[in-house]
Each structure stands twice: as structure tokens, then as C-alpha cells.
Regions:
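PLD/PLD-like phosphodiesterase catalytic module centered on the HKD motif
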Residues: 1-225
Length: 225
């Protein structure tokens, strides 16, 4: 990080929060990030851009599914080739994350994957944060977007991108919270959790299919009656 970076961050803060007429470098400016198909804007594009420029990354999201992995697969594979290391923390909350996606993420040699075990359904895990570090500067996207195709590309999602030095209070607070969750005893490594989680996930899907079938039969009986 150089003094010029500090100057650019100051300009970015002025433009974002004081006067939008200030001339600043967009790479150093806080931004509102959403999906807008009319303008061809996607949250995915912002995340891919930060991934391709960062020295390391950390992600904490409640839900990861197959489509979300597919959206980011080529970018993540490129980072694997370049040796850019990352950490991804998700959860078994509501048993939503798909084992397929978790298997694929864990197969990437540059990524550490953990899952936070929610003991109490009334104390959920619903984070959505993407942290990118480059030359002593953090760019952090926080908001409503999980790692799913709809969240990253089509849903109405609201997110903000923060820009901060490592010494900035905002970056420090967010990084410390990620580290706290990452090191929590309830955060289990992929190898520790995946087989148990797979069984629970498959059982849930079987129950959901049974409920749908029973509902379909009930509707047919109502029509006959």
C-alpha cells in the first residue's frame, strides 16, 4: 500500500458520502451493488473482478448451491492455477447448501472450506460477506447475496462494497468477526462435516419429495370428490 492509495480512498469516501461531483477512482470508492438486467449489471461481475485482482479472499455466506458454484467455477479455477488462497465459511442452517457445491469447492487446492454447525434453529447463521485483500487494502462486499446463481445474477439484492486499509476500523471489525466465526468450535472442516451433512441433506430431500407426493395425491382426491 502506498500513500497514493490513501489519497484515492479519501477521494472515494468524499464522492460516496459527501459530494458525488468529486472526481475519484471507482476502484477506491464505496459502491452500491445490485443486479439490474436492464443495465447488464450483476453482483457476480463485481465479485469476479475482485477475485481476479486480490492477493487472498475470505467468504462467509449462509447458502451455497450448485448454480452458485457454476457461476464462479472458472474464476475459482483460475485462482487455483495462480495459487491465490481463499477461505469459505458456510453453514448447515436450514440444510440448504448443496453437497455437490461443497464437494466442488473442497476439491480446489487453494480453498479451505468450513461449515458452521447451527445447534439451535432460533439462532441462525445468515451472513453474506465477501472479503478481498490486495496490497494492504480490503474491498468488502456485504449485503444480501448468497452464493447462488439467482442471488449473484438475477434477484433483487442490495449490497455495498467498502474500501478500507487494513488499519481502518470497518475492515478490522469485519475481519475480526470472520476470524471469530472461522475459529469457533462450531466451525467444522469439510472432512469433519461432509458425510454427516450429506446424510441429513439427503434425508431432508426425501421428506420433501414425500410431502410433495402426498400433497399431489390429496389434490387429485379433492378433484375426484
Amino acid at each position: 500500500m502506498h500513500q497514493q492509495d490513501i489519497i484515492e480512498i479519501h477521494k472515494g469516501l468524499q464522492k460516496a458520502y459527501i459530494d458525488n461531483a468529486v472526481n475519484s477512482n471507482l476502484a477506491y470508492s464505496p459502491q452500491f451493488i445490485t443486479n439490474d438486467y436492464k443495465r447488464g449489471v450483476k453482483i457476480l461481475t463485481h465479485i469476479e473482478n475482485q477475485l481476479m485482482h486480490c492477493d487472498e479472499f475470505s467468504i462467509s455466506v449462509a447458502f451455497i448451491n450448485r448454480s452458485g458454484f457454476v457461476e464462479l467455477a472458472e474464476t475459482l479455477k483460475e485462482l487455483e492455477r495462480r495459487g491465490i488462497r481463499g477461505r469459505i465459511l458456510t453453514t448447515d442452517y436450514l440444510c440448504f447448501s448443496e453437497p455437490y457445491a461443497l464437494d466442488k469447492l473442497a476439491s480446489l487446492t487453494n480453498i479451505q472450506l468450513k461449515i458452521y454447525h447451527v445447534k439451535d434453529k432460533n439462532n441462525g447463521f445468515h451472513t453474506k460477506g465477501y472479503l478481498f485483500r490486495e496490497n494492504g487494502i480490503y474491498r468488502i462486499i456485504i449485503g444480501s447475496a448468497n452464493m447462488t446463481q439467482t442471488a449473484l445474477s438475477t434477484n433483487m439484492e442490495w449490497n455495498t462494497q467498502l474500501v478500507s486499509t487494513e488499519q481502518g476500523e470497518m475492515a478490522k471489525s469485519i475481519v475480526q468477526e470472520f476470524e471469530r466465526l472461522w475459529k469457533d468450535e462450531l466451525s467444522k472442516s469439510y472432512d469433519e462435516f461432509i458425510e454427516d451433512y450429506r446424510k441429513i441433506y439427503n434425508r431432508k430431500k426425501q421428506i420433501e419429495r414425500l410431502i410433495r407426493e402426498q400433497h399431489k395425491i390429496a389434490l387429485q382426491n379433492d378433484i375426484v370428490d
